[in-house]
Amino acid sequence: MSFDKIIGQEKVKKRLSFYLDGQHKTLLSPHLLFVAPRGSGKTLLAQTYASQLLNSEGKKRKLITINCSTLTSLKSFINDICIPYVSGKEITILFDEASEIPSAVRMALLTILNPNKENRNDFTYDDVTIEFDFKKVTFLFATTEAHKIFHALVDRLERIDLEEYSNDDLGMIVRKNTDALISDDAMEEVKKVLRGNARKATQMANHICLYLSSCNKQEFIMRDWVDFKNKLGINALGLTPMEIKILKILSEKSLTTLTNLSAKTQMSRQSLQRDTENYLQKLNLMEIAATGRKITAQGRQYLESLK
């Protein structure tokens, strides 16, 4: 089974290869839920898995990908997806952003995916009955927010949690996505600002290509990195200006409430919690206590390094 284009994720790839080997012999694949932070490559991994599922003739089965934010109703799910693509067909359906599945569709999926020894179910809607034969139909789901998916639906799926990318993995992703010659010392600095994110690594490769094209160069060395990061405003550890601003605000007091932080940054509480605090906590630059937020010793050292 081939996942050659996927860097890292060795345990996940072994597990998926096991499922593929079984599907090639029995035509049955478990319905899978891919879970990972944004930019980790979960959709690519799901699509790569789907591209290797076979139909009854031993040929690659067709895949359709649905962005669940566009699923408006159960009626559209049945009329626009199930009737034209599932009824009498062999298909794999990938639900991307699965946390956005509408409640009516979610409840229908509970019936459709109810496990049984026959590995098939019927679903009736407006006098139309659709057969879901799981030797012909496989459902895949991808999400960053598994906690928002109804637990009964999650229980019907095999959950695939992606591993965190190492810095070496990220460096390989950068090199894979550019023909430029990047020196080892420059790559060491590049890896430090990618925030553990595969998508950031791909974007970085594109930016390096643009930089070298503008300079009419083929090689990216340490001197280029210094110029490159200054032009793009890349901060140490890949922190954003807002994350640095938060550290500076936290450094002013021993404790800062989320409400006060929201007022000073003019960001909503939800946005602060979802978009900025996680990475700062991951790097141990800030802590969240019962009474508020505070900067750590490492956070203060980071601010000192900027002076």
Sequence positions of predicted segments:
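Dynamic helix-loop-helix/coil hinge segments at AAA+ ATPase domain boundaries and subdomain interfaces
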Residues: 1-15, 235-237
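Short glycine-rich substrate-engagement loop in P-loop NTPases that contacts/grips substrate
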Residues: 13-14, 60-88
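Conserved AAA+ ATPase "SRH/arginine-finger" region at the nucleotide-binding site
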Residues: 144, 158-170
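C-terminal helical "lid" of AAA+/P-loop NTPase domains
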Residues: 188-192, 199-214, 248, 278
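Terminal-proximal interaction/regulatory segments of ATP-powered molecular machines
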Residues: 254-307
